[in-house]
Structure formats: structure tokens, C-alpha cells
Amino acid sequence: MKLYLLLFMYFISAFSFADGVSPDSTRYIYPEDARDITALISNESANAAFVQYWLDPGDSEELTAKLPVTPFELTPPISRINPGSNQTLRIRLMDKSTIPADRESLWWLNVLDIPPVSKTPSAETKDSVQLAVRSRFKMFYRPAGLSDRNTATQQVTFQSGSHSIRVNNNSPYHITITEITLADKKQILHKSFMLQPKSRSEIAVKRAVTRGDRLIISNINDYGGNVTFTATAE
């Protein structure tokens, strides 16, 4: 009896890839005044790849039978990419009436690499397991008229606490914080976190933060790199 299994693997974000299908960035910015943006999808594997693309507004790892409806159009929605070749994926906003104009919006770009199934399987592929790999990447829709993104961290405040700290993001941007250290340069975060625009979050810490402590914070910029800023705990 011949058995073929198709398994799905999910990744919230990817910073490195084995040979296979991968985009040219780990995150994308869609300015409101742009007609569209593009992502270059490359196939570094030895086999042709069949790839499906879509956007979703949440961070769910579930793969549903019906794709979510979004105000964006992706062209093409599915493509075949030969080994060593690439595909330009075009993302275009069709209707912005439902998107907030006073803050950045987060969408997830899904790239599903579907392995081809041989019609005449060999002995090597008999009873084999095939993996369809879904990778997810952040896409930020950025309305015109927002304050300078480079000054967003200046609008983040940190309130002292014993087991957790309160972080207020008064900026209209998403801010991903990967590390917070005190004067002794020891990491106090259990894990990285992303601040929603104009939000307040309670973040667990490994040690107490007292009022007046100088914090050194690492956050991810538009290019996927880590940059630091400082703040004083209130």
C-alpha cells in the first residue's frame, strides 16, 4: 500500500531559510501613497515550487479552508517557480475605507510552498512524507500624515514594577521590543513582544524595575535590524 502524507508547518516569521522558497525581506511597508508594493519570491531548491500567497489581518497559525477577505489584491495568487528562478508578487490596496487612518495597520503575508506530487512515484518516494511549508511575514500599512517613524520610540514610556512593567506606546506605530537591559546589561525580558499603536501593555520581567532606572531597549526597525534607545522608568 502506498502512503503519501501532506503535512503543514507554520512559521510566524523567518530570519533564515534552508534551500527552498523565500521572499526578499522579513517585513514589508506599504505607504498609503504607494500604488502597490512588490515582494520578490525566490526558489533556491532543486525542484519546481508551487506557491500560494495571501494576506490575513491576524496572527493565527491555523490554515483554514477559506482564505480571509482583505482590502488587498495579490497578483498572482498562486504561481509555479522553477529552480533558481523567482516570482514578483504584487500587492495592491483596493479599498482603504475600512483601514484606520490615524495609525499603522498590521497584515500578515502568507507564502505557502506546496510540494509537487509525482504521478509515478519511485521506490524512494514510496511511503514518503511531503512537507508544505507556510511562512508568514509582517506587512505594515502606513497611512500618510503620521508622525516620523524614527521618533516613535520617544513616545514609549515604561512604568516600574516588581514582576511586570507597564509599557505605554503613545505612537501610531507598531514597535517590536526584543530586549530590555538595566545598568548591569542583563536582559530582564522573558521574551520579545510587539506593542500595538496607541496601546498599553503589561509585560512580565525577570527582575524588579524601580523608578529612575535607566533602561536600554532594543527594537526592530523597518529593515528588520535591531536598534537601541534609552528610557527612564517612571
Predicted regions and their residues:
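Short, basic/aromatic beta-hairpin or loop at an interaction surface
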Residues: 58-68, 177-181
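Intrinsically disordered, low-complexity Pro/Gly/Ser/Thr-rich segments with frequent PxxP/GP/PP motifs
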Residues: 63-97, 185-212
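Terminal connector regions
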Residues: 95-146, 212-234
